[in-house]
Amino acid sequence: MTDYNLTHLKQLEAESIHIIREVAAEFERPVMLYSIGKDSSVMLHLARKAFFPGKPPFPLMHVDTTWKFQDMITFRDQQAAKFGLDLIVHINEDGVRQGIGPFTHGSAKHTDVMKTESLKQALNKYKFDAAFGGARRDEEKSRAKERVYSFRDSNHRWDPKNQRPELWNLYNGKINKGESIRVFPLSNWTELDIWQYIYLENIELVPLYFSAKRPVVERDGTMIMVDDDRMPLKPGETPMMKDVRFRTLGCYPLTGAIESTATTLPEIIQEMLLTTSSERQGRVIDHDQAGSMEQKKREGYF
């Protein structure tokens, strides 16, 4: 008998496809959370592979804070149209009416109202019982201890001290009425794995991941791109054109750019091989307080 050996990327791919198919078969109303970033793009690619030549048997859902980069929204709509996907876009209209925003109310309040509460609204509205997310364990310490099947109570809260064991590739999806799970098919991937897979599979991405001259201002050691005229400039503050790109994407006022000349996937991968910092250092929301990500997840965040 000939041994059949998979590369580590093909092993990760097979594991993720298995998880996606398992959830589609086991739950009544799954949904794939689509944040438009590189991890979401890989997860969507895996979902399309899992059910090819058919379409994924669940919709995509984007929780729109109204503060995403303009390039992200354009890319989102292009991808949905290109692949004929069922796309749900949910906005917390109560937050919009209150004028909640990162500049007027701060990152913590903005994230809570326009992301966490908005997500919970959407999950309740459409009665989804399983939601795929693109989080990875190497991103941040609270995500490192979260299971692939992450159970949430009827209020969508996560209890890190009450997680089910996951042995090998066996997942327990039994839930009580009103409960739900968040599912993370990319849990065991690293940032470098993601970039190598994108290169291998020729996956399309938002242009913001590639270096270009962009208008930025530096605030508290973070380079923030001026994406539209809603961003108030401080006295004496003038946007400077710099060669920058983004390792992670979110709301533009809360996402820091990095100086880079990497304009191609091989150049980005080369940068990843040399970097010693986390991609989430550019996320302002992660610096709100000690353990802020775990607290957000306990409250129902992605």
Swiss-Prot record:
According to its UniProt record, in which pathway does this protein act? Sulfur metabolism; hydrogen sulfide biosynthesis; sulfite from sulfate: step 1/3
Tell me the superkingdom of the source.
Bacteria
Q: Which reaction does it catalyse?
A: sulfate + ATP + H(+) = adenosine 5'-phosphosulfate + diphosphate
Known CDD domains for this protein?
Sulfate_adenylyltransferase_2 (cd23946)
Q: Which UniProt keywords apply?
A: ATP-binding, Nucleotide-binding, Nucleotidyltransferase, Transferase
Region annotation (Disordered) ranges: 280-302
Query: What EC number is given for this enzyme?
Result: 2.7.7.4
Q: Where is the signal peptide?
A: none
Gene Ontology molecular functions? ATP binding; sulfate adenylyltransferase (ATP) activity
Q: Please give the start and end residues of each transmembrane region.
A: none
Give the enzyme class. Answer: transferase
A Gene Ontology annotation in the biological process aspect, one of them, is: hydrogen sulfide biosynthetic process
Q: Does the keyword Repressor apply?
A: no
Tell me how this protein assembles. Heterodimer composed of CysD, the smaller subunit, and CysN.
Q: Which family does it belong to?
A: Belongs to the PAPS reductase family. CysD subfamily.
**What is the recorded function of this protein according to its Swiss-Prot or TrEMBL entry?**
With CysN forms the ATP sulfurylase (ATPS) that catalyzes the adenylation of sulfate producing adenosine 5'-phosphosulfate (APS) and diphosphate, the first enzymatic step in sulfur assimilation pathway. APS synthesis involves the formation of a high-energy phosphoric-sulfuric acid anhydride bond driven by GTP hydrolysis by CysN coupled to ATP hydrolysis by CysD.
Q: Which PANTHER family match?
A: SULFATE ADENYLYLTRANSFERASE SUBUNIT 2
Q: Identify this protein by name.
A: Sulfate adenylyltransferase subunit 2
Organism taxonomic ancestry: Bacteria, Pseudomonadati, Pseudomonadota, Gammaproteobacteria, Oceanospirillales
